[in-house]
Amino acid sequence: MKRQKRDRLERARTKGYQAGLAGRSKELCPYQCIDARGYWLGGWRDAVDERSQGYMVN
């Protein structure tokens, strides 16, 4: 069960990262669960930071 939960949270982080790279607002987070929402926002923050520092090249 713990592995499944971790995988779900990692997927939330990945989806948040992708949303951040695409320039979407953090208000569009699809998760209601606090844990998943936190992971999604963490991924989103990482992507936004990388975009602002110029790491991502389209």
From Swiss-Prot:
The keyword Cytoplasm applies. GO terms for cellular component: cytoplasm. InterPro entries: Ribosome_modulation_factor (IPR007040), RMF_sf (IPR023200). GO terms for biological process: regulation of translation. Keywords: Cytoplasm, Translation regulation. During stationary phase, converts 70S ribosomes to an inactive dimeric form (100S ribosomes). This is Ribosome modulation factor. It comes from Tolumonas auensis (strain DSM 9187 / NBRC 110442 / TA 4).
